[in-house]
Amino acid sequence: MSQVLEHLESAETDFLFFSQTICPYCTRAERTLDAHGLTYTEVNLDHHEGLREDVVTETRHRTVPVVFDLRGDEPVFVGGSDNLLEYL
């Protein structure tokens, strides 16, 4: 099982997003989710060796944040910060 799937399956929140330490768009995603009263799990790619490559392979999304909606039966790949704003 990929590291991405492990994180998606273990999260017990409304959303999960992959981030990096210095990332204004990740902060924007956090603030957006907070403003909508949604819970989220943040996974910092800087702290998980090889995870960034797995995220790119699974989503083809090369920038952070990489956001998933976990509220349904299956995780939904939302995209990045701009995509999240449109999605909500």
Region spans (language model):
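Structural micro-motif
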Residues: 59-68, 81
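Acidic phosphotransfer microenvironment of two-component signaling modules
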Residues: 21, 49, 82
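Nucleotide phosphate-binding site architecture
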Residues: 24, 46, 85
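Short amphipathic alpha-helix with an adjacent loop that forms part of the alpha/beta core around
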Residues: 52-59, 88
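Thiol-based oxidoreductase modules, predominantly thioredoxin-like and allied folds used
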Residues: 38-52, 61-62
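Non-catalytic, surface beta->alpha helical segment in thiol-disulfide oxidoreductase systems
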Residues: 69-88
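Local sequence-structure signature of Cys/Sec-based thiol-disulfide redox active-site neighborhoods
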Residues: 2-41
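Alpha-helical elements of the RecA-like P-loop NTPase motor core of helicases
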Residues: 27, 31, 53, 86
